[in-house]
Design a protein with these regions (language model features):
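Active-site SXXK
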Residues: 66-91, 115
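Bacterial N-terminal signal peptides that target proteins for export
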Residues: 1-7
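Extracytoplasmic
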Residues: 38-40, 62-64, 68-73, 89, ...
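Beta-lactamase-like hydrolase cores
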Residues: 19-65
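Mid-domain, small-residue-enriched loop/turn segments at the edges of structured enzyme/sensor domains
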Residues: 104, 111-112, 126-167
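Active-site-proximal loop and beta-strand segments within enzyme catalytic domains
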Residues: 83-110
Length: 167
C-alpha cells in the first residue's frame, strides 16, 4: 500500500517539475482571483486531455521562483514518517509534550489526522528528529522534491531551513 502511495506522490511531484516553460500560456485574467482574496500568488494548470498537453499559468515569474514548502510539506513528511516507522498509522495517538503554544489546537494529544488539520508543528518536528537529516535527504531525493536539502541551522527545515520547492 505505501509503495503505491510513494509512486503516486513521486509521479505528482515529478510531473509538476517537468513542465516546459516555453509551452506555457499566460492567463493574466486570473489575477482577479488573487486580488479579490487580497493575496499574492501563482497558479499553473496542466491540461493533459490535449495532445500535446496545454499549460496555463498566471504569474510565470512567481511560478518559477523557489519557496519554503512550509505546511504543504506535511503530505510527503507524513509518508516519510510512516515509512521510517516514526508513526504507525493515522490512528496512533501522539502524546502532547505539555508545552503551551499559541494555537489551542496544538495543545493536545494528536493523531496524523489532527496534526495535519491543525498543522501541528511539534508533531512534525518530532518526526524530523526520528527520521534524521541523512534519511530525510534520501527520502527527498527519492521523490525528486525541490532541492532535496533538509539542512537547517534553526527551526523546522521545511519552514526555516534550506529546503525549497517551486511555486
Amino acid at each position: 500500500m505505501i509503495e503505491r502511495v510513494w509512486v503516486a506522490l513521486a509521479a505528482f511531484f515529478i510531473s509538476s517539475i517537468v513542465i516546459a516553460r516555453d509551452s506555457m500560456i499566460d492567463k493574466p485574467e486570473w489575477s482577479k482571483h488573487f486580488t479579490q482574496a487580497g493575496v499574492n500568488g501563482t497558479i499553473v494548470v496542466v491540461d493533459e486531455r490535449k495532445t500535446p498537453a496545454i499549460t496555463l499559468v498566471f504569474d510565470r515569474e512567481r511560478a518559477a521562483r523557489r519557496y519554503s514548502p512550509a505546511s504543504t510539506y506535511k503530505i510527503p513528511h507524513t509518508l516519510f514518517a510512516q515509512d521510517a516507522g516514526a508513526v504507525a498509522d493515522e490512528f496512533q495517538v501522539l502524546k502532547w509534550d505539555g508545552v503551551k503554544r499559541t494555537f489551542a489546537g496544538h495543545n493536545q494529544d494528536q493523531t496524523l489526522r489532527s496534526a495535519m488539520r491543525y498543522s501541528t508543528l511539534w508533531v512534525y518536528e518530532g518526526f524530523a528528529r526520528q527520521i534524521g537529516e541523512p534519511k530525510a535527504r534520501a527520502y527527498l531525493r527519492s521523490i525528486d522534491y525541490g532541492n532535496a536539502d533538509p539542512a537547517t541551522s534553526k527551526g523546522a527545515y521545511w519552514v526555516d531551513g534550506n529546503l525549497r520547492i517551486s511555486a
